[in-house]
Amino acid sequence: MFQGASSLNLDAKGRMTIPARHRDALLLQCEGRITLTKHPDGCLLLFPRPVWEMRREEIAKWPISARAWQRIFLGNASDVDFDGAGRILIAPELRTAAGLTRDVMMMGMGGHFEIWDAARLAESESDAIAAGMPDVLNDFSF
């Protein structure tokens, strides 16, 4: 299970170094083979390839009424591998879709990661806090 936030930078070629704590786990779990795709919240999703392959099968079975969402998730999926320095190359189309510039955040979300433009994530979190807790979390406490 992946958790935690990492503040990272994209280089001029659109490469991002995976933090060592996650890189080691991803190398063990999937030999550094991952899949990136769009998320409608304005970020990218990063899945270990075996996890993505299960998700891909589920998404492919969605009814025709969900075709646009299949296009968003499957049509934008990009398989990538770590390079020798533990970096991944994020395709220009995906960088543009998520508004990724130089400063990015990688958020562990259990079985996958979200990759956000740092400013966009800060705005999203601020909006969520201002909106208050959703009703579904009324009974949740630490």
UniProtKB/Swiss-Prot annotation:
Keyword hit for DNA-binding = yes
Query: Entry's SUPFAM superfamilies?
Result: AbrB/MazE/MraZ-like
Which PROSITE patterns would you find in this protein's record? Answer: SPOVT_ABRB
Q: Where in the cell is it found?
A: Cytoplasm, Nucleoid
Q: What is its main location?
A: cytoplasm
Q: Which Pfam families match?
A: MraZ
Span of domain SpoVT-AbrB:
5-51, 77-120
Keywords from UniProt, A to Z, are:
Cytoplasm, DNA-binding, Repeat, Transcription, Transcription regulation
Q: Which GO terms describe its molecular function?
A: DNA-binding transcription factor activity; transcription cis-regulatory region binding
Q: Which GO terms describe its cellular component?
A: cytoplasm; nucleoid
> Could you give a single Gene Ontology term from the biological process aspect?
negative regulation of DNA-templated transcription initiation
Please give the subunit comment from the record: Forms oligomers.
Q: Describe the family membership recorded for this protein in Swiss-Prot or TrEMBL.
A: Belongs to the MraZ family.
Q: Which PANTHER family match?
A: TRANSCRIPTIONAL REGULATOR MRAZ
Q: What is this protein called?
A: Transcriptional regulator MraZ
Instruction: From the UniProt record, report the name of the gene that encodes this protein.
Output: mraZ
